[in-house]
């Protein structure tokens, strides 16, 4: 092997080891269920951060928007709750039961009325 291939191999192995170390330290920085050592750590969406509370505006079912201290966070919480409430759709009405054609004893087919869309 030439010297450049050896240097490239060493560089790749060092990068791999540093990534492994970084991922292991990121998972160990969580002190307990809510407290974290870094102020910005809770804003990360890293794969080692628990999925249930990885977003700064995540509202748990027992938490109200009044518990947020910052006004922006509180207004964002209220807005997200409003969006969530409006996104819940009413259950769709079931389609009417099919009409049976008395002449043939089969379901009636709906025929569109109005102008022919294929006619120019």
Swiss-Prot record:
Positions of region (Disordered): 85-120
Basic and acidic residues composition-biased segments: 100-110
Keywords: Developmental protein, Differentiation, Glycoprotein, Hydroxylation, Secreted, Signal
Modified residues annotated as Hydroxyproline in this record: 112, 115
Glycosylated residues, chain numbering: 35, 115
GO biological process, one term: regulation of cell differentiation
One GO location term (cellular component): apoplast
Residues of the signal peptide: 1-26
Protein family according to the UniProt entry: Belongs to the CLV3/ESR signal peptide family.
Name under which the protein is recorded: CLAVATA3/ESR (CLE)-related protein 9
Species of origin: Arabidopsis thaliana
Gene (UniProt): CLE9
